[in-house]
Amino acid sequence: MLTIADHQFESRLFTGTGKFATAQTMLDAVGASESQLVTLAVKRLDLNTGSDNILKPLIDSGVKLLPNTAGARNVKEALFAAHLSREMLGTNWIKLEIHPDPKYLMPDPIETLEAARILCEQGYVVLPYVHADPVLCRRLEEVGCAAVMPLGSPIGSNQGLASEPFLKIIIEQAKVPVIVDAGIGAPSQATHAMELGADAVLVNTAIASSRDPVTMGRCFAQAVNTGRQAYIAGLGAVSHQAHNTSPLTGFLND
């Protein structure tokens, strides 16, 4: 079981809700993935008009909703989105995203740390999306974040774990769950993230943009479970020289 703040999850695969061709495809893919935590952008919510046709089915399915501040460019905008999500959804959980550059969507470390500090003081369960920066992740942990979400590679790029050397350091040092977020483009990459010791992964584009999102959701569920079990079992050490699996003894020297 994975524990974040006051909540426990059996599944270590978290999913997003964007980029799916239809709302029904998204709901079916989330169900197939067995994900128990789903993130959605606050800016997509419109409870007054009921135009958001994904919210009620997600709530009815029993998954935990993690609103995110995607689109926020600074502390002020992120705080506004977080306050709005708490009012609209009745949750103090927030995925903190601040990326002022609309082209590459790189998270702003300075604004993110300040917003995280304020939100933690206000009683939020903060899960910040950040660069794979071990120093920044430690600072976020120190201000009270419930988990850290370092990127594998740029959002939606499907480039995999380009930041692997830094992810290893973060995983080694962190005292809160580490959720690899962004850039995971294939089930094999999710497996590898879990083999490194990540506590969970968040996947959206790789599922939503696949030819069959429902089947891909199922594949990612299996991949994450496989990676986690491999990590628990203990991977063999990597060596630069060969080692006999059946040592040669005696009879070849006769």
UniProtKB/Swiss-Prot annotation:
Highest taxon above the source species: Bacteria
> What reaction does this enzyme carry out catalytically?
[ThiS sulfur-carrier protein]-C-terminal-Gly-aminoethanethioate + 2-iminoacetate + 1-deoxy-D-xylulose 5-phosphate = [ThiS sulfur-carrier protein]-C-terminal Gly-Gly + 2-[(2R,5Z)-2-carboxy-4-methylthiazol-5(2H)-ylidene]ethyl phosphate + 2 H2O + H(+)
Q: Function of this protein?
A: Catalyzes the rearrangement of 1-deoxy-D-xylulose 5-phosphate (DXP) to produce the thiazole phosphate moiety of thiamine. Sulfur is provided by the thiocarboxylate moiety of the carrier protein ThiS. In vitro, sulfur can be provided by H(2)S.
GO biological process annotation, one example: thiamine diphosphate biosynthetic process
Question: Into which EC class is this enzyme placed?
Answer: transferase
Similarity comment: Belongs to the ThiG family.
Which HAMAP family would you find in this protein's record?
ThiG
Signal peptide coordinates: none
Q: What is this protein called?
A: Thiazole synthase
Q: Which organism is it from?
A: Shewanella pealeana (strain ATCC 700345 / ANG-SQ1)
Task: Show the CDD domains listed in the entry.
Answer: ThiG (cd04728)
**Subunit structure, briefly?**
Homotetramer. Forms heterodimers with either ThiH or ThiS.
User: Which gene is the coding source of this polypeptide chain?
Assistant: thiG
